A protein has these predicted regions:
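ATP-dependent carboxylate-amine ligase catalytic core
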Residues: 26-35, 60-146, 158, 162-164, ...
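Short active-site-proximal "capping" loops at secondary-structure junctions
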Residues: 45-47, 72-73
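Acidic, Mg2+-coordinating active-site environments of NTP-dependent enzymes
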Residues: 129, 133, 149-190
């Protein structure tokens, strides 16, 4: 699998990430991505279940949905839910080949999560809606580079303090800075 070979070279840690690389890469290549309505999920807890519930709701309304989540438990493929099922190896490899065509040498610059995020956007090009779960959440998250139709904020608590801030207020402020014109915010907060 081409994707596995590529990922074997990547660290899954956030320690050496250039917070602005994803924004620069998207600006450089955004013409290669379709403008599909995106619903972004942000929060400390509850993104996965909220995302899957929302995905199934939209699928029941006969929309074609791509759902990008992290982390995975058993297999990288679990991060990509398309047409009611987890993406298979062939689908991921085809998306990887397309990313190589677009990014060429720039592909190597991306972090594990940035790469996976762009891979999702290629994989979901024929969807009616895309549900993206933020990784680190907030203004510097790889999923925040794309224009979002809506944000859903689940419970916000203490996470990624080295990036988001040391207080709950700082963390919430960082996450809320990327709020789309339409947003739902969970009333159950820490």
């Amino acid at each position: 699998m081409k994707v596995e070979n590529f990922l074997a070279q990547k660290s899954i840690n956030y320690d050496k990430i250039d917070r602005f690389l994803m924004f620069r890469m998207y600006e450089k290549y955004k013409k290669c991505f379709k403008n599909i309505p995106i619903i972004q999920l942000i929060g400390t807890n509850g993104k996965g279940s909220t995302g899957r519930y929302l995905t199934q709701l939209l699928e029941n309304l006969n929309y074609k949905i791509g759902h990008y989540t992290s982390p995975h438990i058993f297999s990288f493929n679990e991060r990509f839910y398309l047409d009611g099922k987890i993406a298979n190896d062939e689908e991921l490899d085809q998306a990887h080949i397309r990313l190589e065509e677009i990014f060429k040498q720039d592909l190597q610059k991306l972090s594990y999560f940035e790469y996976a995020t762009f891979l999702a956007m290629i994989l979901f090009q024929k969807c009616d809606f895309i549900v993206l779960e933020a990784g680190v959440g907030g203004e510097y998250d790889a999923t925040s580079v794309f224009e979002r139709r809506m944000n859903i904020f689940t419970r916000i608590g203490f996470d990624h303090v080295q990036i988001l801030g040391n207080s709950l207020e700082d963390i919430a402020r960082t996450k809320l800075k990327i709020m789309a014109p339409i947003a739902l915010i969970s009333d159950e907060q820490e």
